Amino acid sequence: MRTGQQYLESLRDGRQVYVGGELIDDVTTHPKTSGYAKAIAEYYDLHLDPEHQDVLTFVDDDGVRKSMHWFLPRSKADAARRRAYHEFWFRHFQGGIFTRPPAGMHVVMYAQIDDPEPWGDNAVVAGGRTISFADNIRSQWQRVTTDDVALSPMFVDVQFDRGRDDALVETPMLSIVEQNDQGIVVRGWKAMGTSLPFVNELLVGNLWRPGQTSDQTVYAIVPVNTPGLSLVCRQSNATPDADPYDHPLSTIGDELDGMAYFDDVFIPWENVQHIGNPDHAKWYPQRQFDWVHIETQIRHAVHAELIVGLALLLTNALGTNNNPIVQSQLADLVRFRETCKAFAIAAEETGFTTAGGLFKPNNIYVDLGRAHYLENIHNAVNQLIEFCGRGVVMSPTKADFDHPFLGPKLEEALRGTSISARDRVSIFRQISERYLTQWGARHEMFEKFNGTPLYLVRLLTMQRTEYQVDGPLTDLARQVLGFGDTEALAARAAEVEKNSNWASVAYQPEYAREQDVRDGYYKETEKV
Protein backbone atom coordinates (compact mmCIF):
# COMPACT_ATOMS: atom_id res chain seq x y z
CA MET A 1 0.00 0.00 0.00
CA ARG A 2 1.28 3.45 -0.78
CA THR A 3 1.09 6.64 1.24
CA GLY A 4 -0.81 9.75 0.30
CA GLN A 5 2.46 11.51 -0.48
CA GLN A 6 3.53 8.71 -2.80
CA TYR A 7 0.18 8.99 -4.53
CA LEU A 8 0.61 12.74 -5.05
CA GLU A 9 4.13 12.21 -6.40
CA SER A 10 2.75 9.68 -8.91
CA LEU A 11 0.53 12.40 -10.40
CA ARG A 12 3.54 14.61 -11.21
CA ASP A 13 4.48 12.66 -14.31
CA GLY A 14 4.15 15.09 -17.21
CA ARG A 15 0.54 14.24 -18.00
CA GLN A 16 -1.42 16.47 -20.38
CA VAL A 17 -4.52 17.62 -18.49
CA TYR A 18 -6.80 20.42 -19.69
CA VAL A 19 -9.49 21.86 -17.40
CA GLY A 20 -11.74 24.50 -18.89
CA GLY A 21 -9.26 25.02 -21.72
CA GLU A 22 -6.30 25.53 -19.39
CA LEU A 23 -3.32 23.17 -19.39
CA ILE A 24 -2.72 22.18 -15.78
CA ASP A 25 1.00 21.99 -14.98
CA ASP A 26 0.57 20.14 -11.69
CA VAL A 27 -2.80 18.70 -10.66
CA THR A 28 -1.62 18.42 -7.05
CA THR A 29 -1.15 22.19 -6.64
CA HIS A 30 -3.45 23.93 -9.13
CA PRO A 31 -6.54 25.46 -7.44
CA LYS A 32 -8.92 23.71 -9.85
CA THR A 33 -7.59 20.25 -9.05
CA SER A 34 -5.59 20.26 -5.81
CA GLY A 35 -8.59 19.80 -3.50
CA TYR A 36 -9.57 16.43 -4.92
CA ALA A 37 -5.96 15.29 -5.20
CA LYS A 38 -5.50 15.97 -1.48
CA ALA A 39 -8.76 14.16 -0.68
CA ILE A 40 -7.54 11.02 -2.45
CA ALA A 41 -4.13 11.34 -0.78
CA GLU A 42 -6.03 11.20 2.50
CA TYR A 43 -7.84 8.14 1.13
CA TYR A 44 -4.52 6.32 0.77
CA ASP A 45 -3.22 7.47 4.15
CA LEU A 46 -6.31 6.22 5.95
CA HIS A 47 -5.62 2.72 4.64
CA LEU A 48 -2.38 2.86 6.63
CA ASP A 49 -4.05 4.06 9.83
CA PRO A 50 -4.08 1.18 12.38
CA GLU A 51 -7.43 2.44 13.68
CA HIS A 52 -9.11 1.50 10.38
CA GLN A 53 -6.98 -1.51 9.47
CA ASP A 54 -9.70 -4.13 9.96
CA VAL A 55 -12.18 -2.32 7.69
CA LEU A 56 -9.88 -0.88 5.03
CA THR A 57 -7.29 -3.61 4.48
CA PHE A 58 -6.88 -7.37 4.11
CA VAL A 59 -4.01 -9.85 4.05
CA ASP A 60 -3.61 -11.70 0.74
CA ASP A 61 -2.61 -15.35 0.23
CA ASP A 62 1.07 -14.39 0.34
CA GLY A 63 0.71 -12.68 3.71
CA VAL A 64 0.89 -9.17 2.26
CA ARG A 65 -1.47 -6.53 3.64
CA LYS A 66 -3.29 -4.69 0.85
CA SER A 67 -6.07 -2.20 0.39
CA MET A 68 -9.59 -3.60 0.34
CA HIS A 69 -10.07 -2.02 -3.08
CA TRP A 70 -8.18 -5.09 -4.39
CA PHE A 71 -10.11 -7.62 -2.27
CA LEU A 72 -11.76 -10.40 -4.31
CA PRO A 73 -14.82 -11.73 -2.43
CA ARG A 74 -15.16 -15.51 -2.28
CA SER A 75 -18.04 -15.87 0.19
CA LYS A 76 -21.16 -14.10 1.41
CA ALA A 77 -19.18 -12.87 4.41
CA ASP A 78 -16.59 -11.40 2.02
CA ALA A 79 -19.34 -9.54 0.15
CA ALA A 80 -20.62 -8.07 3.42
CA ARG A 81 -17.06 -7.06 4.28
CA ARG A 82 -16.74 -5.25 0.97
CA ARG A 83 -20.05 -3.48 1.62
CA ALA A 84 -18.72 -2.23 4.96
CA TYR A 85 -15.60 -0.99 3.15
CA HIS A 86 -17.56 0.98 0.57
CA GLU A 87 -19.92 2.35 3.21
CA PHE A 88 -16.90 3.66 5.12
CA TRP A 89 -15.76 5.71 2.15
CA PHE A 90 -19.16 7.08 1.21
CA ARG A 91 -19.66 8.22 4.78
CA HIS A 92 -16.15 9.65 4.92
CA PHE A 93 -16.69 11.55 1.67
CA GLN A 94 -19.73 13.45 2.94
CA GLY A 95 -22.38 10.92 1.98
CA GLY A 96 -20.92 10.02 -1.40
CA ILE A 97 -20.03 13.40 -2.90
CA PHE A 98 -17.05 11.70 -4.55
CA THR A 99 -18.63 8.95 -6.59
CA ARG A 100 -15.48 7.41 -8.04
CA PRO A 101 -12.70 7.02 -5.49
CA PRO A 102 -10.27 4.22 -6.37
CA ALA A 103 -12.49 1.76 -4.46
CA GLY A 104 -15.21 2.33 -7.03
CA MET A 105 -13.06 1.98 -10.14
CA HIS A 106 -10.69 -0.92 -9.55
CA VAL A 107 -13.61 -3.35 -9.52
CA VAL A 108 -13.83 -3.05 -13.31
CA MET A 109 -11.03 -5.62 -13.48
CA TYR A 110 -12.79 -8.15 -11.23
CA ALA A 111 -14.69 -9.86 -14.06
CA GLN A 112 -11.51 -10.00 -16.14
CA ILE A 113 -9.31 -11.64 -13.52
CA ASP A 114 -12.20 -13.94 -12.57
CA ASP A 115 -12.53 -15.28 -16.15
CA PRO A 116 -9.69 -14.04 -18.39
CA GLU A 117 -9.75 -16.78 -21.04
CA PRO A 118 -12.60 -15.38 -23.23
CA TRP A 119 -10.70 -12.12 -23.61
CA GLY A 120 -8.09 -14.02 -25.58
CA ASP A 121 -10.27 -16.72 -27.11
CA ASN A 122 -12.61 -14.15 -28.66
CA ALA A 123 -9.89 -11.82 -29.95
CA VAL A 124 -9.08 -11.22 -33.61
CA VAL A 125 -5.45 -10.22 -34.22
CA ALA A 126 -4.01 -9.27 -37.60
CA GLY A 127 -0.93 -10.78 -39.18
CA GLY A 128 -1.32 -14.24 -37.71
CA ARG A 129 0.10 -13.09 -34.38
CA THR A 130 -0.65 -15.13 -31.30
CA ILE A 131 -1.12 -12.95 -28.23
CA SER A 132 -2.02 -14.45 -24.86
CA PHE A 133 -4.45 -11.80 -23.68
CA ALA A 134 -5.52 -13.95 -20.72
CA ASP A 135 -1.92 -14.00 -19.48
CA ASN A 136 -1.76 -10.25 -20.09
CA ILE A 137 -4.74 -9.72 -17.80
CA ARG A 138 -3.20 -11.89 -15.07
CA SER A 139 0.09 -9.98 -15.29
CA GLN A 140 -1.68 -6.63 -15.30
CA TRP A 141 -3.66 -7.59 -12.20
CA GLN A 142 -0.48 -8.65 -10.42
CA ARG A 143 1.21 -5.37 -11.30
CA VAL A 144 -1.60 -2.95 -10.42
CA THR A 145 -2.35 -4.67 -7.12
CA THR A 146 1.32 -4.83 -6.13
CA ASP A 147 2.00 -1.19 -7.06
CA ASP A 148 -1.43 0.01 -5.81
CA VAL A 149 -2.10 1.74 -9.12
CA ALA A 150 -5.10 4.08 -9.43
CA LEU A 151 -7.27 3.17 -12.44
CA SER A 152 -10.17 4.84 -14.22
CA PRO A 153 -12.36 2.99 -16.75
CA MET A 154 -13.24 4.66 -20.06
CA PHE A 155 -15.80 2.67 -22.03
CA VAL A 156 -18.18 5.30 -23.43
CA ASP A 157 -17.66 6.57 -26.97
CA VAL A 158 -18.46 9.93 -28.53
CA GLN A 159 -22.03 10.93 -29.33
CA PHE A 160 -21.89 11.26 -33.11
CA ASP A 161 -24.91 10.38 -35.25
CA ARG A 162 -26.94 7.82 -33.36
CA GLY A 163 -29.73 7.87 -35.89
CA ARG A 164 -27.87 5.55 -38.27
CA ASP A 165 -26.27 2.22 -37.45
CA ASP A 166 -23.71 2.74 -40.20
CA ALA A 167 -22.65 6.11 -38.77
CA LEU A 168 -20.35 4.49 -36.23
CA VAL A 169 -17.64 3.92 -38.84
CA GLU A 170 -17.54 7.69 -39.39
CA THR A 171 -17.08 8.61 -35.75
CA PRO A 172 -13.75 9.82 -34.36
CA MET A 173 -13.96 7.19 -31.62
CA LEU A 174 -10.84 5.35 -30.50
CA SER A 175 -9.69 2.95 -33.24
CA ILE A 176 -6.68 0.87 -34.11
CA VAL A 177 -4.68 2.41 -36.95
CA GLU A 178 -1.76 -0.02 -36.86
CA GLN A 179 -0.81 -3.44 -35.50
CA ASN A 180 2.82 -4.54 -35.39
CA ASP A 181 5.01 -7.01 -33.51
CA GLN A 182 5.42 -4.63 -30.57
CA GLY A 183 1.80 -3.60 -30.06
CA ILE A 184 -0.95 -1.42 -31.47
CA VAL A 185 -1.29 2.25 -32.38
CA VAL A 186 -4.62 3.90 -31.62
CA ARG A 187 -6.19 7.19 -32.59
CA GLY A 188 -9.40 8.95 -31.54
CA TRP A 189 -11.57 9.79 -28.56
CA LYS A 190 -12.92 8.08 -25.51
CA ALA A 191 -15.85 10.18 -24.42
CA MET A 192 -16.27 9.80 -20.68
CA GLY A 193 -14.26 9.01 -17.58
CA THR A 194 -14.34 10.20 -13.98
CA SER A 195 -11.36 11.36 -11.90
CA LEU A 196 -9.18 11.24 -15.01
CA PRO A 197 -6.58 13.79 -13.80
CA PHE A 198 -6.18 11.89 -10.53
CA VAL A 199 -5.41 8.33 -11.66
CA ASN A 200 -2.29 6.63 -12.94
CA GLU A 201 -3.73 4.54 -15.76
CA LEU A 202 -6.84 4.38 -17.93
CA LEU A 203 -8.64 1.12 -18.56
CA VAL A 204 -10.18 1.66 -21.99
CA GLY A 205 -12.86 -0.54 -23.48
CA ASN A 206 -16.15 -0.57 -25.39
CA LEU A 207 -19.83 -0.85 -24.72
CA TRP A 208 -21.12 -2.36 -27.96
CA ARG A 209 -23.15 -0.31 -30.40
CA PRO A 210 -24.64 -1.35 -33.76
CA GLY A 211 -22.14 -0.94 -36.57
CA GLN A 212 -19.06 -1.22 -34.36
CA THR A 213 -16.03 -2.38 -36.35
CA SER A 214 -13.15 -4.66 -35.51
CA ASP A 215 -10.67 -1.77 -35.36
CA GLN A 216 -12.95 0.09 -32.94
CA THR A 217 -12.96 -2.82 -30.48
CA VAL A 218 -10.09 -2.12 -28.09
CA TYR A 219 -9.53 -3.05 -24.44
CA ALA A 220 -6.25 -2.00 -22.85
CA ILE A 221 -4.53 -0.32 -19.92
CA VAL A 222 -2.88 2.99 -20.83
CA PRO A 223 -0.72 5.09 -18.46
CA VAL A 224 -2.05 8.64 -18.25
CA ASN A 225 1.34 10.15 -19.13
CA THR A 226 1.69 8.13 -22.36
CA PRO A 227 2.95 10.36 -25.22
CA GLY A 228 0.08 11.52 -27.42
CA LEU A 229 -2.60 11.16 -24.74
CA SER A 230 -4.52 14.30 -23.73
CA LEU A 231 -7.20 14.53 -21.04
CA VAL A 232 -9.87 17.18 -21.65
CA CYS A 233 -11.93 17.75 -18.51
CA ARG A 234 -15.07 19.73 -17.93
CA GLN A 235 -14.93 23.05 -16.12
CA SER A 236 -14.18 22.59 -12.45
CA ASN A 237 -16.91 23.35 -9.92
CA ALA A 238 -14.45 23.51 -7.04
CA THR A 239 -14.40 26.72 -4.96
CA PRO A 240 -11.06 26.55 -3.15
CA ASP A 241 -11.13 30.20 -2.08
CA ALA A 242 -14.63 30.12 -0.56
CA ASP A 243 -15.42 29.61 3.11
CA PRO A 244 -16.38 26.00 3.93
CA TYR A 245 -19.38 27.28 5.88
CA ASP A 246 -20.80 28.87 2.74
CA HIS A 247 -19.74 26.07 0.38
CA PRO A 248 -19.34 22.91 2.46
CA LEU A 249 -18.84 20.58 -0.51
CA SER A 250 -17.22 22.42 -3.42
CA THR A 251 -14.45 23.69 -1.13
CA ILE A 252 -13.38 20.06 -0.66
CA GLY A 253 -12.80 19.62 -4.39
CA ASP A 254 -14.26 18.30 -7.64
CA GLU A 255 -13.52 14.79 -8.91
CA LEU A 256 -13.81 16.02 -12.53
CA ASP A 257 -15.10 14.09 -15.52
CA GLY A 258 -13.42 14.27 -18.88
CA MET A 259 -12.69 12.98 -22.35
CA ALA A 260 -9.43 11.50 -23.60
CA TYR A 261 -7.85 12.04 -27.02
CA PHE A 262 -5.33 9.52 -28.31
CA ASP A 263 -3.08 11.03 -30.98
CA ASP A 264 -1.47 7.94 -32.51
CA VAL A 265 -0.78 6.47 -29.08
CA PHE A 266 1.33 3.32 -28.95
CA ILE A 267 0.12 0.55 -26.60
CA PRO A 268 2.48 -2.42 -26.15
CA TRP A 269 0.93 -5.87 -26.40
CA GLU A 270 1.45 -6.58 -22.70
CA ASN A 271 -0.99 -3.74 -21.90
CA VAL A 272 -3.67 -4.95 -24.33
CA GLN A 273 -6.56 -7.08 -23.03
CA HIS A 274 -8.59 -7.72 -26.18
CA ILE A 275 -8.97 -6.43 -29.73
CA GLY A 276 -10.88 -7.16 -32.87
CA ASN A 277 -14.20 -8.78 -31.94
CA PRO A 278 -17.27 -6.50 -31.65
CA ASP A 279 -19.38 -9.44 -30.43
CA HIS A 280 -17.13 -9.68 -27.37
CA ALA A 281 -18.21 -6.13 -26.51
CA LYS A 282 -21.86 -7.19 -26.31
CA TRP A 283 -21.58 -9.28 -23.15
CA TYR A 284 -18.30 -9.20 -21.26
CA PRO A 285 -18.16 -5.46 -20.45
CA GLN A 286 -21.58 -5.73 -18.80
CA ARG A 287 -20.12 -8.36 -16.49
CA GLN A 288 -17.33 -5.93 -15.66
CA PHE A 289 -19.76 -3.20 -14.72
CA ASP A 290 -21.90 -5.52 -12.62
CA TRP A 291 -19.18 -5.10 -10.01
CA VAL A 292 -19.26 -1.32 -10.36
CA HIS A 293 -23.03 -1.33 -9.92
CA ILE A 294 -22.70 -3.23 -6.65
CA GLU A 295 -20.65 -0.33 -5.34
CA THR A 296 -23.17 2.10 -6.85
CA GLN A 297 -26.04 0.43 -5.00
CA ILE A 298 -24.16 0.77 -1.71
CA ARG A 299 -23.58 4.48 -2.40
CA HIS A 300 -27.27 4.94 -3.13
CA ALA A 301 -28.22 3.45 0.24
CA VAL A 302 -25.78 5.76 2.05
CA HIS A 303 -27.08 8.78 0.13
CA ALA A 304 -30.66 7.87 1.00
CA GLU A 305 -29.64 7.66 4.66
CA LEU A 306 -28.13 11.14 4.44
CA ILE A 307 -31.38 12.53 3.02
CA VAL A 308 -33.35 11.03 5.90
CA GLY A 309 -30.89 12.43 8.44
CA LEU A 310 -30.98 15.92 6.94
CA ALA A 311 -34.78 15.82 6.85
CA LEU A 312 -35.03 14.80 10.52
CA LEU A 313 -32.55 17.46 11.67
CA LEU A 314 -34.19 20.11 9.50
CA THR A 315 -37.78 19.50 10.57
CA ASN A 316 -36.68 19.39 14.19
CA ALA A 317 -34.87 22.72 13.78
CA LEU A 318 -37.97 24.23 12.17
CA GLY A 319 -40.35 22.75 14.73
CA THR A 320 -42.40 20.97 12.08
CA ASN A 321 -41.40 17.41 12.94
CA ASN A 322 -44.53 16.71 15.02
CA ASN A 323 -46.93 17.77 12.28
CA PRO A 324 -48.84 14.64 11.13
CA ILE A 325 -48.40 15.51 7.45
CA VAL A 326 -44.67 16.04 7.92
CA GLN A 327 -44.39 12.79 9.85
CA SER A 328 -46.05 10.96 6.96
CA GLN A 329 -43.61 12.55 4.52
CA LEU A 330 -40.68 11.63 6.75
CA ALA A 331 -41.95 8.05 6.78
CA ASP A 332 -41.77 8.04 2.97
CA LEU A 333 -38.11 9.05 3.13
CA VAL A 334 -37.35 6.41 5.74
CA ARG A 335 -39.01 3.77 3.55
CA PHE A 336 -36.92 4.94 0.59
CA ARG A 337 -33.72 4.51 2.58
CA GLU A 338 -34.68 1.14 4.04
CA THR A 339 -35.70 -0.20 0.63
CA CYS A 340 -32.38 0.84 -0.92
CA LYS A 341 -30.54 -0.94 1.88
CA ALA A 342 -32.80 -4.00 1.60
CA PHE A 343 -31.93 -4.45 -2.07
CA ALA A 344 -28.21 -4.39 -1.21
CA ILE A 345 -28.68 -7.03 1.48
CA ALA A 346 -30.92 -9.14 -0.78
CA ALA A 347 -28.23 -9.07 -3.48
CA GLU A 348 -25.71 -10.48 -1.02
CA GLU A 349 -28.08 -13.07 0.44
CA THR A 350 -28.98 -14.45 -2.99
CA GLY A 351 -25.51 -14.13 -4.51
CA PHE A 352 -23.71 -16.93 -6.33
CA THR A 353 -20.22 -18.24 -6.95
CA THR A 354 -18.80 -17.55 -10.41
CA ALA A 355 -16.89 -20.04 -12.52
CA GLY A 356 -13.69 -18.39 -11.33
CA GLY A 357 -14.61 -18.73 -7.67
CA LEU A 358 -15.73 -15.19 -6.82
CA PHE A 359 -18.86 -14.64 -4.76
CA LYS A 360 -20.97 -12.20 -6.75
CA PRO A 361 -24.01 -10.48 -5.24
CA ASN A 362 -27.13 -11.18 -7.30
CA ASN A 363 -27.02 -8.66 -10.14
CA ILE A 364 -30.80 -8.81 -10.53
CA TYR A 365 -31.32 -7.32 -7.07
CA VAL A 366 -28.53 -4.87 -7.78
CA ASP A 367 -30.30 -3.69 -10.94
CA LEU A 368 -33.71 -3.60 -9.25
CA GLY A 369 -32.21 -1.60 -6.41
CA ARG A 370 -30.58 0.88 -8.79
CA ALA A 371 -33.88 1.28 -10.62
CA HIS A 372 -35.72 1.89 -7.33
CA TYR A 373 -33.23 4.61 -6.42
CA LEU A 374 -33.43 6.36 -9.79
CA GLU A 375 -37.23 6.20 -9.78
CA ASN A 376 -37.52 7.77 -6.32
CA ILE A 377 -34.51 10.00 -5.72
CA HIS A 378 -36.08 13.08 -7.33
CA ASN A 379 -39.15 12.86 -5.12
CA ALA A 380 -36.95 12.39 -2.06
CA VAL A 381 -34.82 15.43 -2.86
CA ASN A 382 -37.86 17.55 -3.72
CA GLN A 383 -39.44 16.58 -0.41
CA LEU A 384 -36.29 17.63 1.43
CA ILE A 385 -36.29 20.99 -0.36
CA GLU A 386 -39.97 21.50 0.41
CA PHE A 387 -39.21 20.98 4.09
CA CYS A 388 -36.71 23.87 3.80
CA GLY A 389 -39.09 26.44 2.39
CA ARG A 390 -37.45 29.78 1.68
CA GLY A 391 -34.65 29.05 4.12
CA VAL A 392 -32.74 27.05 1.51
CA VAL A 393 -32.45 30.23 -0.58
CA MET A 394 -32.35 32.93 2.10
CA SER A 395 -29.31 31.66 3.97
CA PRO A 396 -26.86 34.20 5.41
CA THR A 397 -23.16 33.71 4.76
CA LYS A 398 -20.43 33.35 7.35
CA ALA A 399 -19.50 36.96 6.67
CA ASP A 400 -23.06 37.99 7.55
CA PHE A 401 -22.88 36.16 10.85
CA ASP A 402 -19.43 37.59 11.59
CA HIS A 403 -20.57 41.17 10.92
CA PRO A 404 -20.56 43.17 14.18
CA PHE A 405 -23.96 44.75 13.52
CA LEU A 406 -25.79 42.09 11.46
CA GLY A 407 -24.45 39.02 13.20
CA PRO A 408 -26.21 39.34 16.56
CA LYS A 409 -29.49 40.25 14.89
CA LEU A 410 -29.28 37.25 12.54
CA GLU A 411 -28.46 34.98 15.47
CA GLU A 412 -31.65 36.15 17.14
CA ALA A 413 -33.87 36.01 14.05
CA LEU A 414 -32.79 32.61 12.72
CA ARG A 415 -32.36 30.53 15.84
CA GLY A 416 -34.36 27.31 15.85
CA THR A 417 -35.77 24.79 18.26
CA SER A 418 -32.80 23.94 20.50
CA ILE A 419 -30.38 24.91 17.73
CA SER A 420 -28.34 28.04 17.06
CA ALA A 421 -28.88 30.18 14.00
CA ARG A 422 -25.48 29.25 12.56
CA ASP A 423 -26.10 25.53 12.94
CA ARG A 424 -29.61 25.81 11.55
CA VAL A 425 -28.41 27.74 8.50
CA SER A 426 -25.63 25.19 7.97
CA ILE A 427 -28.35 22.60 7.30
CA PHE A 428 -29.85 24.86 4.64
CA ARG A 429 -26.44 25.47 3.07
CA GLN A 430 -25.65 21.77 2.92
CA ILE A 431 -28.93 21.07 1.15
CA SER A 432 -28.53 24.06 -1.16
CA GLU A 433 -25.06 23.17 -2.40
CA ARG A 434 -25.80 19.47 -2.65
CA TYR A 435 -28.98 19.84 -4.70
CA LEU A 436 -29.41 23.41 -6.00
CA THR A 437 -26.04 24.39 -7.47
CA GLN A 438 -23.99 23.52 -10.54
CA TRP A 439 -21.83 21.37 -8.27
CA GLY A 440 -24.93 19.46 -7.19
CA ALA A 441 -26.37 19.26 -10.71
CA ARG A 442 -23.26 17.46 -11.93
CA HIS A 443 -23.65 14.96 -9.10
CA GLU A 444 -27.29 14.39 -10.08
CA MET A 445 -26.37 13.83 -13.73
CA PHE A 446 -23.63 11.41 -12.75
CA GLU A 447 -26.05 9.24 -10.80
CA LYS A 448 -28.57 9.40 -13.63
CA PHE A 449 -26.24 8.19 -16.38
CA ASN A 450 -23.01 6.71 -14.98
CA GLY A 451 -24.34 3.20 -14.48
CA THR A 452 -26.62 3.17 -17.54
CA PRO A 453 -29.83 5.24 -17.65
CA LEU A 454 -33.02 4.04 -16.00
CA TYR A 455 -34.64 2.61 -19.14
CA LEU A 456 -31.57 0.48 -19.82
CA VAL A 457 -31.44 -0.74 -16.22
CA ARG A 458 -35.02 -1.95 -16.69
CA LEU A 459 -34.20 -3.52 -20.05
CA LEU A 460 -31.22 -5.38 -18.61
CA THR A 461 -33.44 -6.72 -15.85
CA MET A 462 -35.80 -8.26 -18.41
CA GLN A 463 -32.94 -9.66 -20.48
CA ARG A 464 -31.09 -11.26 -17.60
CA THR A 465 -33.84 -12.83 -15.50
CA GLU A 466 -36.55 -15.47 -15.64
CA TYR A 467 -39.18 -12.73 -15.87
CA GLN A 468 -40.43 -14.23 -19.14
CA VAL A 469 -43.71 -15.77 -20.25
CA ASP A 470 -42.24 -19.28 -19.97
CA GLY A 471 -40.38 -18.56 -16.73
CA PRO A 472 -41.20 -19.54 -13.15
CA LEU A 473 -43.13 -16.33 -12.47
CA THR A 474 -45.97 -17.55 -14.70
CA ASP A 475 -46.22 -20.97 -13.03
CA LEU A 476 -48.88 -19.91 -10.53
CA ALA A 477 -50.90 -17.94 -13.10
CA ARG A 478 -50.92 -20.89 -15.52
CA GLN A 479 -51.97 -23.19 -12.69
CA VAL A 480 -54.85 -20.89 -11.72
CA LEU A 481 -55.99 -20.64 -15.34
CA GLY A 482 -55.60 -24.35 -15.96
CA PHE A 483 -53.30 -23.71 -18.90
CA GLY A 484 -50.59 -26.22 -18.11
CA ASP A 485 -47.09 -25.43 -19.34
CA THR A 486 -46.27 -23.26 -22.33
CA GLU A 487 -45.76 -26.29 -24.57
CA ALA A 488 -49.35 -27.38 -23.91
CA LEU A 489 -50.56 -23.86 -24.68
CA ALA A 490 -48.65 -23.82 -27.95
CA ALA A 491 -49.94 -27.27 -28.93
CA ARG A 492 -53.56 -26.24 -28.39
CA ALA A 493 -53.03 -23.04 -30.35
CA ALA A 494 -51.48 -24.98 -33.24
CA GLU A 495 -54.39 -27.43 -33.32
CA VAL A 496 -56.94 -24.62 -33.46
CA GLU A 497 -55.00 -22.86 -36.18
CA LYS A 498 -54.68 -26.02 -38.27
CA ASN A 499 -58.45 -26.54 -38.35
CA SER A 500 -59.47 -22.91 -38.70
CA ASN A 501 -60.68 -21.21 -41.85
CA TRP A 502 -58.84 -17.99 -41.09
CA ALA A 503 -55.51 -19.78 -40.80
CA SER A 504 -55.73 -22.07 -43.82
CA VAL A 505 -56.66 -19.28 -46.24
CA ALA A 506 -54.61 -16.49 -44.73
CA TYR A 507 -53.36 -14.11 -47.38
CA GLN A 508 -55.11 -16.02 -50.20
CA PRO A 509 -56.54 -13.51 -52.73
CA GLU A 510 -59.43 -15.80 -53.65
CA TYR A 511 -60.71 -15.95 -50.10
CA ALA A 512 -60.34 -12.23 -49.61
CA ARG A 513 -62.22 -11.54 -52.85
CA GLU A 514 -65.09 -13.83 -51.79
CA GLN A 515 -65.48 -11.91 -48.55
CA ASP A 516 -65.53 -8.58 -50.39
CA VAL A 517 -68.22 -9.81 -52.79
CA ARG A 518 -70.26 -11.31 -49.95
CA ASP A 519 -70.19 -8.08 -47.96
CA GLY A 520 -70.96 -5.88 -50.95
CA TYR A 521 -67.60 -4.15 -51.11
CA TYR A 522 -66.86 -5.49 -54.56
CA LYS A 523 -69.04 -6.36 -57.53
CA GLU A 524 -67.89 -9.01 -59.98
CA THR A 525 -68.09 -7.88 -63.61
CA GLU A 526 -69.80 -10.29 -65.94
CA LYS A 527 -67.59 -11.89 -68.52
CA VAL A 528 -68.57 -11.09 -72.11
Curated annotation (Swiss-Prot):
InterPro entries on file: Acyl-CoA_Oxase/DH_mid-dom_sf, AcylCo_DH-like_C, AcylCoA_DH/oxidase_NM_dom_sf, HpaB/PvcC/4-BUDH, HpaB/PvcC/4-BUDH_C, HpaB/PvcC/4-BUDH_N
Name of the protein in its database record: 4-nitrophenol 4-monooxygenase/4-nitrocatechol 2-monooxygenase, oxygenase component
UniProt keyword list: Aromatic hydrocarbons catabolism, FAD, Flavoprotein, Monooxygenase, NAD, Oxidoreductase
Name of the gene this protein is made from: npcA
Reported pH dependence: Optimum pH is 8.
Cofactor(s) for this UniProt protein: FAD
Family: Belongs to the FADH(2)-utilizing monooxygenase family.
Catalytic activity: 4-nitrophenol + NADH + O2 + H(+) = 4-nitrocatechol + NAD(+) + H2O; 4-nitrocatechol + NADPH + O2 = 2-hydroxy-1,4-benzoquinone + nitrite + NADP(+) + H2O; 4-nitrocatechol + NADH + O2 = 2-hydroxy-1,4-benzoquinone + nitrite + NAD(+) + H2O
Positions bound to FAD: P153, M154, F155, Q159, F160, D161, R162, T194, T461, M462, Q463, R464
Domain of life: Bacteria
Pathway annotation: Aromatic compound metabolism; Xenobiotic degradation
Assembly and oligomerization: The 4-NP/4-NCA monooxygenase is composed of an oxygenase component NpcA and a reductase component NpcB.
SUPFAM superfamilies the record matches: Acyl-CoA dehydrogenase C-terminal domain-like (SSF47203), Acyl-CoA dehydrogenase NM domain-like (SSF56645)
Induction (record text): By 4-NP.
